[in-house]
From Swiss-Prot:
Keywords noted in UniProt: 3Fe-4S, Electron transport, Iron, Iron-sulfur, Metal-binding, Transport
InterPro entries per record: 3Fe4S_ferredoxin, 4Fe4S_Fe-S-bd, Fe-S_cluster_ET
Pfam families for the chain: Fer4_15
UniProt protein name: Ferredoxin soy
Function: Electron transport protein for the cytochrome P-450-SOY system.
GO molecular function, one term: electron transfer activity
Cofactor note: Binds 1 [3Fe-4S] cluster.
Domain of life: Bacteria
Positions contributing to [3Fe-4S] cluster binding: C10, C16, C55
Domain 4Fe-4S ferredoxin-type: 2-29
Organism lineage string: Bacteria, Bacillati, Actinomycetota, Actinomycetes, Kitasatosporales
Organism: Streptomyces griseus
Length: 65
């Protein structure tokens, strides 16, 4: 299970980066993104579920890939 950030939905609130800073960061435009190399394995990280719930616009999603 992996995690993704939908850049079209992201408003840059940064809740995911605050909740799971070792999985998420914010780019130069302030939009959230998954840290390089963490996309495929981050779904099992203990705080990713919290980050998914914390996103105010639902831009952070778990994928079954």
């Amino acid at each position: 299970m992996g995690v993704q950030v939908d850049k079209e939905r992201c408003v840059g609130a940064g809740m995911c980066a605050l909740t799971a800073p070792d999985v998420f960061t914010q780019d130069d435009d302030g939009l959230s993104e998954v840290l390089p190399g963490r996309e495929a394995t981050s779904g099992t990280h203990p705080l990713v579920g919290e980050a998914v719930r914390a996103c105010p616009v639902g831009a952070v999603v778990l994928s079954s890939d």
